[in-house]
């Protein structure tokens, strides 16, 4: 029997939602509420292929949820709120407390709140959504799905920093990794496409958007990933620096007069593609400028691809080989230029990719390797909402 599952991603001033029919994984409706707490909040919903946009003053997340539920009934999506069988909430940071998705109770709420120091921009916002939904839909099961959970299978040798061990024990300082829901989805989808048990696959997942992370997935489990204690670590991103020498922070402070918080802001919001190019954090803009012969745009593109390229080599070594490379998220799914730069020169490890096929693939699921290639290369559009809905369904005791 089909179940209706709500997949929710709550930000500090936004609420993204999808209502999904499971197990068919059919999107019934989806939408976004923006500018919550501000004047002229925008509510957008897609029903039967039509996009409907309304402007309201929405004071808080509770009011946003009420408007969303009323809209479902108004547009005939549901007859009653009790048609919804369960709700899955994206939560950015689960720390070591949550190695998997969990039913939300008052105690779980407190634990999520206790992890806010690890994700001060995200966990409090995620909690606002959780509390609003639990208040308005108290009879419906609510499940927290954590970005970090998928990476909790990493062994200590992968997640531990070479710092005094007591820092890990006392303060939880370690690599956590992010984009776990996306990496989990595409790894499972790759196994389905190949018709092979995921337990037999060594897979490198490249989630490349404005934020980007690479994951080594061995037998369906994350064994390493590029992001670290925060999403700042790893590869070059739209505005984030990725890995740098930590000694640069006091050096930059001394040279610029900035304090630590200001330097951290620079690393998070003024670096990456934006910092190198000096013009944009959007890969599409960078590619356009590079085609026009602008040297710094070309340099930004080269650095961006080079960092991903290095992680692929590193993770192939980590798993003693690789069977599948997956490209996903906005850039990974749509930029044949970035994919080509990342894959260039990987023939030595069994990656034979078809340049013409690669150029033709934008935002669709497809192989871009030659048939004889030992390593398969697949573009897979991510679907974190479906992965969230699957986790809710997997609890198995929905009404």
UniProtKB/Swiss-Prot annotation:
Keywords: ATP-binding, Cytoplasm, Kinase, Magnesium, Metal-binding, Nucleotide-binding, Transferase. Its cofactor is Mg(2+); Mn(2+). It is found in: Cytoplasm. The active site is at residue 147. Its EC number is 2.7.2.1. GO terms for molecular function: acetate kinase activity; ATP binding; magnesium ion binding. It holds the Pfam family Acetate_kinase. GO terms for biological process: acetate metabolic process; acetyl-CoA biosynthetic process. InterPro entries: Ac/propionate_kinase, Aliphatic_acid_kin_short-chain, Aliphatic_acid_kinase_CS, ATPase_NBD. CDD domains: ASKHA_NBD_AcK_PK. ATP binds at residues 16, 207-211, 282-284, 330-334. Mg(2+) binds at residues 9, 384. Pathway: Metabolic intermediate biosynthesis; acetyl-CoA biosynthesis; acetyl-CoA from acetate: step 1/2. It catalyses: acetate + ATP = acetyl phosphate + ADP. The record marks 179, 240 as: Transition state stabilizer. Substrate binds at residue 90. Mg(2+). Can also accept Mn(2+). GO terms for cellular component: cytoplasm. Catalyzes the formation of acetyl phosphate from acetate and ATP. Can also catalyze the reverse reaction. NCBIfam families: ackA. Belongs to the acetokinase family. Homodimer. This is Acetate kinase. It comes from Staphylococcus saprophyticus subsp. saprophyticus (strain ATCC 15305 / DSM 20229 / NCIMB 8711 / NCTC 7292 / S-41).
């Amino acid at each position: 029997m089909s179940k209706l599952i709500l997949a929710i991603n709550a930000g500090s001033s936004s609420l993204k939602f999808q209502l999904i029919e499971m197990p068919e994984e059919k999107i019934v409706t989806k939408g976004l509420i923006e500018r919550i707490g501000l004047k002229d909040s925008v509510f957008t919903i897609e029903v039967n292929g039509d996009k409907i946009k309304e402007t309201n003053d929405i004071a808080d997340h509770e009011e946003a949820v009420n408007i969303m539920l009323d809209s479902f009934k108004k547009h005939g999506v549901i007859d009653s709120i009790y048609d919804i069988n369960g709700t899955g909430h994206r939560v950015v940071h689960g720390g070591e407390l949550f190695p998997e998705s969990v039913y939300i109770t008052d105690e779980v709420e407190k634990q999520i709140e206790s992890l806010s120091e690890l994700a001060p921009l995200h966990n409090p916002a995620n909690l606002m959504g959780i509390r609003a939904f639990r208040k308005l839909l108290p009879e419906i099961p609510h499940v927290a799905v954590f970005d970090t959970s998928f990476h909790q299978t990493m062994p200590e040798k992968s997640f531990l920093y070479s710092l005094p061990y007591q820092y890990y024990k006392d303060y939880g300082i370690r690599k956590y990794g992010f984009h776990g829901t996306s990496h989990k989805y595409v790894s499972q989808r790759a196994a389905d496409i190949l018709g092979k048990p995921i337990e037999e696959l060594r897979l490198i997942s490249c989630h490349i958007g404005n934020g980007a992370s690479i994951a080594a997935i061995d037998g369906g489990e994350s064994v390493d990933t590029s992001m670290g204690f925060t999403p700042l670590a790893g590869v070059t991103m739209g505005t984030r620096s990725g890995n740098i020498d930590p000694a640069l922070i006091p050096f930059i402070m001394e040279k610029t007069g900035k304090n630590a918080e200001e330097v951290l802001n620079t690393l998070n919001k003024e670096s990456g593609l934006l910092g190198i190019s000096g013009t944009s954090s959007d890969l599409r803009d960078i590619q356009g400028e590079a085609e026009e012969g602008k040297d710094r745009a070309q340099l930004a593109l080269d650095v961006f691809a080079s960092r991903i390229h290095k992680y692929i080599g590193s993770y192939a070594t980590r798993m003693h080989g690789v069977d599948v490379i997956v490209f996903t998220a906005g850039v990974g799914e749509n930029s044949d230029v970035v994919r080509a730069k990342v894959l260039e020169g990987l023939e030595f490890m069994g990656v034979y990719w078809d340049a013409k096929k690669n150029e033709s693939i934008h935002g669709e699921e497809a192989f871009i390797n030659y048939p004889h290639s030992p390593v398969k290369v697949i573009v897979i559009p991510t679907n974190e909402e479906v992965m969230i809905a699957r986790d809710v369904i997997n609890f198995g005791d929905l009404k």
